[in-house]
Amino acid sequence: MLCTIGDLIEDVVVWLSAEPNLGTDTDSIIQRTRGGSAANVAMFAALTGTESRFIGQVGNDALGQQLCSSLQQAGVDVCVVAEGRTGSIVVLVQPNGERTFLTDRGVASHLSLVDASLMANVGILHVPSYSLVTEPLASTSLLYIKAAQSLGAVISIDASSTSVLEHFGIARYKSLIQSIQPQVFLCNGDEAGLLGVGATEGMPGAALTVIKRGAHSTLAISQNNEHCEVTVAPVANIVDTTGAGDAFAAGFLPTFVATNDVEVAIARGHAIAARVLRSPGATLDVA
């Protein structure tokens, strides 16, 4: 089973027809979807054949119930605390595809309840860095990581966002990852550049670092600095990049654990990510 810890929130995706006209109207297409990096990974995993579980906190409100229901319908084992107000993120998509995020995470970072029994049948625990930088969720996530490690689970960390890394502090973040010692560390090219990894070495403390570089080849670096580059197949008719990195994780992680083949796992990750790129928001197209 693949388990994730973190945020389950609403994404309000706004496709702008032009640069915003401040003080007046701008024609747009607006769509509401389930979001949150941890929830996305769990859902994409379930929809593509991997048993998955999501652990987090949502509000005790209609939106929280709706979001949980959408995960359950996808086949995810949903384990949440329902208390407070569910968060939302507004994603502004410019005509050139550039995205801007307006973030209100609500109670997503308020999770403090730890139920170690939820790790009993977990083979992979995936934790976005969003879950490691704000209390009490950060301490809760670390306790789950320790519980999973004690049972032999593979630990995966995603860098999540350059803004998250900068706000937390690069040196502090690298020290945190060093202390966790994850088997897999996932990041994109911008995050890798900020962390100073990729050119000669992977993320300190991680057994395997995987750097996704958009349409360019994906780079994998082992702890002993062995490099592997995998070409990314071009994707036609890209609609939206929201959730593509989460889809990659949902494909890469179970395949890597099952096969121990980095190239095969990267190809699987990109195959699922391509389905998200062709669909609006963090959703899969029809395979």
Residue spans for each PLM region:
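Short, basic and Ser/Thr-rich N-terminal targeting/leader segments
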Residues: 48, 84-87
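Conserved phosphate-binding/catalytic region of the ribokinase-like
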Residues: 1-3, 26, 147, 196-287
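Short, glycine/acidic-enriched loop or turn micro-motifs at the edges of active sites
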Residues: 9-10, 14, 60, 161, ...
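Short, conserved phosphate/pyrophosphate- and ester-handling motifs at nucleotide-, phospho-/glycolipid
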Residues: 45, 188, 245
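Ribokinase/PfkB-type carbohydrate-kinase core domain
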Residues: 1-8, 69-81, 93-228
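Glycine-rich phosphate/adenosyl-contacting loop at the front of the ribokinase-like
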Residues: 1-55, 62-66, 238
